[in-house]
């Protein structure tokens, strides 16, 4: 889904976020979003690794 957003779309999102939250809150929100995204990727990687490991065990 995010791969369909181009540079103009990202700029528009940032401008809207700046207007809504203000310049002081924006870094805090970005940091929280980054940490959440990192944790989500870590969880999905762990789940994928478990599934692949289980499939490898079933093949043997």
UniProtKB/Swiss-Prot annotation:
<dbReference type="GO" id="GO:0043953">
    <property type="term" value="P:protein transport by the Tat complex"/>
</dbReference>
<keyword id="KW-0813">Transport</keyword>
<comment type="subunit">
    <text>Forms a complex with TatC.</text>
</comment>
<keyword id="KW-0812">Transmembrane</keyword>
<keyword id="KW-1003">Cell membrane</keyword>
<dbReference type="InterPro" id="IPR006312">
    <property type="entry name" value="TatA/E"/>
</dbReference>
<keyword id="KW-1133">Transmembrane helix</keyword>
<dbReference type="GO" id="GO:0033281">
    <property type="term" value="C:TAT protein transport complex"/>
</dbReference>
<feature type="transmembrane region" description="Helical">
    <location>
        <begin position="1"/>
        <end position="21"/>
    </location>
</feature>
<dbReference type="InterPro" id="IPR003369">
    <property type="entry name" value="TatA/B/E"/>
</dbReference>
<dbReference type="GO" id="GO:0008320">
    <property type="term" value="F:protein transmembrane transporter activity"/>
</dbReference>
<protein>
    <recommendedName>
        <fullName>Sec-independent protein translocase protein TatA</fullName>
    </recommendedName>
</protein>
<keyword id="KW-0472">Membrane</keyword>
<comment type="similarity">
    <text>Belongs to the TatA/E family.</text>
</comment>
<dbReference type="Pfam" id="PF02416">
    <property type="entry name" value="TatA_B_E"/>
</dbReference>
<comment type="function">
    <text>Part of the twin-arginine translocation (Tat) system that transports large folded proteins containing a characteristic twin-arginine motif in their signal peptide across membranes. TatA could form the protein-conducting channel of the Tat system.</text>
</comment>
<keyword id="KW-0653">Protein transport</keyword>
<keyword id="KW-0811">Translocation</keyword>
């Amino acid at each position: 889904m995010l791969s369909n957003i181009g540079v103009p779309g990202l700029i528009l999102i940032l401008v809207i976020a700046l207007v809504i939250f203000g310049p002081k809150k924006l870094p805090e929100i970005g940091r929280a979003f980054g940490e959440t995204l990192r944790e989500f990727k870590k969880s999905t990687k762990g789940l994928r690794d478990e599934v692949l490991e289980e499939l490898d065990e079933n093949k043997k």
